[in-house]
A protein has these predicted regions:
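Conserved, mostly hydrophobic/aromatic
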Residues: 68, 97, 148, 200, ...
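Glycoside hydrolase catalytic-domain groove-lining segments
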Residues: 91-94, 234-238, 254-325, 335-336, ...
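Aromatic-lined substrate-binding rim segments of carbohydrate-active enzymes
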Residues: 89-156, 216-240, 281-294
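Short, acidic/polar
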Residues: 80-98, 179-189, 249-259, 340-344
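Aromatic-rich peripheral "rim/lid" segments of glycoside hydrolase catalytic domains that contact
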Residues: 290, 311-322, 326, 331-342, ...
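N-terminal carbohydrate-binding accessory modules
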Residues: 38-102
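Active-site cleft segment of glycoside hydrolase catalytic domains centered on the general acid/base Glu
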Residues: 120, 126-130, 156-260, 264, ...
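C-terminal motif of bacterial Sec signal peptides marking the signal peptidase cleavage site
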Residues: 20-23
Length: 437
């Protein structure tokens, strides 16, 4: 997710910046109080809702991806967090997701998110072992896995793409070899664990910047190394490249041009889309179709999310919240969150060759402490906040200064007590809808 770097700055500058991207283009769902139900005709998943209304989205394919990044779950469970379905039954959270129409899980992988003493950097301490835990549970519940390699020891986004500690000082040829070997070894571990790998993402929000490199010839070489390893270990998996900032006209077309110029082998051009940063739905569609139509690639919305409340639930500032970040027509409410998700899905379904949508960290809730001090202890011990103090050695200018809790707990699809929100039902309701036109 783009934005942890700028959580504090965004809060301070919101009154200036948010007016630029406040409208998403439409809001097709409305709230109604009568009980209604919907069935996902592709999976026979049936849900009902007393409060939520979701308008049907046309032209959703049977294999449309309703995905969820759920990378932080093991670290939260280590804090004592439990998850509950809509009937207050405690369950494996991945089972709850599957029961509500989610068919794909996305998990990020950092090479070595620990200091020399074994203290985790936070953000879920998302190494390969964490990915195996997540992947096994996804597969056990009938969901495929998107493996998201950052090729860093911590968050990689448009502003920072630090190479792993072990790769610092390497030449580009050495780094490409390291990417190839690391990707291959990691995917083999996942495959050997019986995990159903459907897609492999080579880099995260690589906007002309990846693993410390800013030259497109070098970036393309790194991507090609990751793609080659993927083809060898997971020949049936789709290779995904991920970018951000679709609000910038022709930016994606420029990236796709460079990828084509350097012959990078990939299948899917992925975009982040957060309405409070990334402009309108119409622009998102336009920019992605410049890639799918010109280069014959598939597209996917790899990240999106929206707030169900303005409340901060863990004593750490949120990316959006009270007084800032609301997109026009989408209040911070469970219905508002559902409307946003429904309309992102509708946009994806309208884009040429778009595979689907992944909601970002919809399971990342507060660590469970009753005070900031209690939460801080949990964040430091289990890595359940966005960054721990231990990351200062690796990321001194961002994580080292602004470490703390979750900045997106109010954008989860579970409440602060771990109970599934009604908005989680959107995935199952959206094929048929439960709202009369």
């Amino acid at each position: 997710m783009k934005g942890f770097t700028f959580v504090i700055a965004l809060i301070m500058a919101c009154s200036i910046s948010l007016s630029m991207f406040s409208s998403c283009g439409r809001n097709d769902a409305v709230q109604n109080s009568d009980t209604a139900s919907g069935t996902d005709s592709a999976t026979n998943i049936k849900v009902t809702s007393d409060t939520l209304r979701v308008k049907k989205v046309d032209n959703i394919s049977d294999d449309f991806i309703f995905g969820m990044d759920a990378s932080c779950v093991p670290s939260l469970e280590a804090c004592g967090i439990k998850y509950y379905d809509h009937n207050n039954n405690e369950k494996d959270v991945y089972k709850i997701l599957a029961e509500n129409g989610v068919n794909y899980i996305r998990v990020r992988i950092w090479n070595d998110p620990f200091d020399k003493n074994g203290n985790g950097y936070g953000g879920g301490n998302c190494d390969i072992e964490n990915a195996i835990k997540v992947g096994k549970r996804a597969t056990q519940n009938g969901m495929k896995l998107l493996v998201n390699f950052h090729y860093s020891d911590f968050w990689a986004d448009p502003q920072k793409q630090a190479p792993p500690k072990a790769w610092q000082g390497m030449s580009i040829d050495e780094k490409c070899d390291a990417v190839y070997k690391y990707t291959k070894e990691s995917l083999k571990k996942l495959a050997d664990a019986g995990i159903d790998i459907g897609m492999v993402q080579v880099g995260n929000e690589t906007n002309g910047f990846m693993c410390g490199e800013k030259d497109w010839a070098k970036i393309s070489a790194l991507m090609s190394a990751g793609s080659k390893a993927t083809r060898e270990i997971c020949p049936e998996a789709l290779v995904v490249l991920h970018f951000s900032n679709p609000e910038l006209v022709n930016r994606y077309a420029g990236y796709a041009y460079e990828l084509n110029r350097f012959g990078v082998d990939y299948d899917v051009f992925a975009s982040s889309y957060y309405s409070f940063w990334h402009g309108t739905f119409e622009n998102l569609k336009t920019e992605l179709e410049k890639v799918t139509s010109r280069y014959g690639k598939k597209a996917i919305i790899a990240e999106t999310s929206y707030a169900y409340t303005a409340e901060d639930t863990d004593f750490h500032a949120n990316t959006i919240g009270s007084g800032f970040g609301a997109s026009e027509g989408y209040p911070f409410s469970v219905q508002g969150q559902a409307n946003m998700l429904r309309d992102v899905i509708a946009t994806a379904a309208s884009i040429e060759n778009c595979l689907g949508v992944f909601y970002w960290e919809g399971t990342w809730i507060a660590a469970g402490g009753k005070t900031q001090a209690e939460n801080r202890e949990l964040w430091e011990k289990h890595g359940s906040g966005w960054a721990s103090s231990f990351v200062a050695e690796y990321d001194p200018e961002d994580g080292g200064k602004w470490y703390g809790g979750c900045a997106v707990d109010n954008q989860a699809l579970f409440d602060k007590n771990g109970k599934a929100l009604e908005s989680l039902k959107v995935f199952a309701l959206v094929r048929e809808g439960n709202l009369d036109s």
